[in-house]
Amino acid sequence: MIVSGLALGCDTVGHEGALLAEGKTIAVLPTPIDAPVYPSQNQGLADRIVGGGGALVSEYAPGAMLHDKQLVSNLVARDEWQPGLSDGVIAIETSVAGGTNHAMKHAQGTNTPIAVFDYSSRMGEDFYADERFGGNVKYLKDGAFPIFEASTIEDFKIAMESYRQRNFRGASGGTALGRDSQLNLFG
């Protein structure tokens, strides 16, 4: 399952990839659920997410009136909600100041596993010098799980499962709850 923010770029590609694979995806919105989708270019994608059995979620009550000045802080809040709905966070491409950093920092603060794409084997030293990947480089130095080929994505999935097993136990402290018992959004 893909949880992302419906932003243009990697978020859009992630949601569309999940739908193409007939998987589920959740879009965390920076606006109330009944407001126009932001960004408006992704209204059709939002409709396909819901039509495909996914979900649009928002922390803002339907009908809430939000001002344009609030959008920046809403975008940050949206980014911070995503790790809370996820077993792990993967950064595809982020600069040091990119919005992805809000999600990554929140994940680090809650000990949610993080991974970043490591393009150094393809780009060589250019990877470390390219500002578009400054955040990737930073998180790799901080110990994020490196993803550089398909098998490392599978390894990260194992790390996320281990995290879930350690952190989501029943009230009795017994065996770990299954995914469906933890969060059954899709019935």
Regions found by a protein language model. Give the residues of each.
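Glycine-biased, small-residue-rich flexible motifs in mid-sequence functional cores and linkers
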Residues: 1-187
